[in-house]
Structure formats: structure tokens, C-alpha cells
Amino acid sequence: MEAIAKYDFKATADDELSFKRGDVLKVLNEECDQNWYKAELNGKDGFIPKNYIEMKAHPWFFGKIPRAKAEEMLGKQRHDGAFLIRESESAPGDFSLSVKFGNDVQHFKVLRDGAGKYFLWVVKFNSLNELVDYHRSTSVSRNQQIFLRDIEQVPQVHGGDRATSLPQQPTYVQALFDFDPQEDGELGFRRGDFIQVVDNSDPNWWKGTCLSQTGMFPRNYVTPVNRNM
């Protein structure tokens, strides 16, 4: 994932990474420490303070969502190529690409070379973002023509009335109750917190960002707000 530096940071230890405000960093690991991430910039990697950066939210990144949950969500999509990227369950620190095709969901391991570049087959990329953009027009599969397309925001139906999906760019909700994550990939928050919604295609669980963390949360714990942030 990518992050934008909010402030300058000068390394004070050999394993830290210096950067300037506005730099775009590649976050390699969000689990090293609750206050520090491991990141890469200009071919160098090291630890950075998490409160100095702002994660770039992407509707296709679902973090530690289980493979079965990915298949359930993508199975509801109408179009081939609907996809998400998640952290690998079998190989911590790696990523998997899950894509709907026909009645199935295919899974691709995102590989990395010694220089830290990402790839599925031959063409390599500096970030997951670049990999995703490339495979919107170049098939992710060698056997079928599968082009990535964003998950569709499906309006939900309640009691016979069709409720319009929340507006995009961006949508915020406010927490009605505290929520403590019970599984990997869930987003914790406190009552009153504002959460940016990045995916609301599932009727029960939405994906959002709060305090630079991204994950899934129960829809009935929040209420929509009109807020420009």
C-alpha cells in the first residue's frame, strides 16, 4: 500500500527511514509495531512513525480479509473482473489478488522480486497500485481474458424499498457504539469516531478507514453523516 508523508521525518537510528512532507512511501508491513510501519522510499527501506503519514485509501484493498470472505463478497458481484487485494493468509507479509470470473473466484499470489517489485507473471511494478492499473487493460490470467474492474457498489433493498447506495468521494459515517475487532481485517473504533466508507457493497459489513487504519466493520454500528473532511 502507499502512504503520503504529512511531515518531514529525519531518521535517528540505522533502521529508520527519512522522508520529506509530500513523499509517497510504499508501506511494506503494518504489523511491526503499533507506532511504526516498515516502508520503502527510493529503493531504501526502514521504519517510519505511523502518525507522520496518511494511508492512501483504495476501495480494492481489504487487508486481512479471509479467503472465504473474499469469495463470498465477490460472488455477489455481477461482472467478471470484480476484484480485491488482501493480505495472504498462508504467507504473512505477502498479498493475494482475488478476482471474479464466471461463477467462480480465482486467486493469484502477488509475487515480489529481490528489489521489492510486485508482479503476477513477467511485467514488474513498483507498487500494488501500478500492478492493479496495468491489469485493468491486460489480463491477469494466461488462460482466460480477465481484466480488473472495481467492485460495484450495489444498492441494498430493505423491506421492499430500494435504498440508494451512499454517495461516493467520499462518504463518512459516525460510530454509534464502540467496536472492538474480533477477527483480522476488522476495523476498531470508539463511539463518535468518523469513518470514511470505501466500500458498502455488502449489506452487513462495510469497509472503511479511521485514524489511518482500514478494515471491515458492522454496518449497524454507524450512522451516515454529511461531512466534508
UniProtKB/Swiss-Prot annotation:
Primary localisation category: nucleus
Q: What are the GO MF terms of this UniProt record? A: epidermal growth factor receptor binding; insulin receptor substrate binding; phosphotyrosine residue binding
Any one Pfam family here would be SH2
The record, for Gene3D superfamilies, names:
SH2 domain (3.30.505.10), SH3 Domains (2.30.30.40)
Q: Which InterPro entries match?
A: Grb2-like, GRB2_C_SH3, GRB2_N_SH3, SH2, SH2_dom_sf, SH3-like_dom_sf, SH3_domain
GO BP of this protein: female meiotic nuclear division; insulin receptor signaling pathway; regulation of MAPK cascade; signal transduction
Task: Report the residue ranges that make up the SH3 domain in this protein.
Answer: 1-58, 168-227
| Signal peptide interval | none
The record's listing under SMART domains reads: SH2 (SM00252), SH3 (SM00326)
Q: Domain notes, please?
A: The two SH3 domains and the SH2 domain are necessary for the reinitiation of oocyte meiosis.
Protein known as: Growth factor receptor-bound protein 2-A
Organism per entry: Xenopus laevis (African clawed frog)
Question: Which classification does the entry list for the species?
Answer: Eukaryota, Metazoa, Chordata, Craniata, Vertebrata
What gene name is given for the protein in this entry? grb2-a
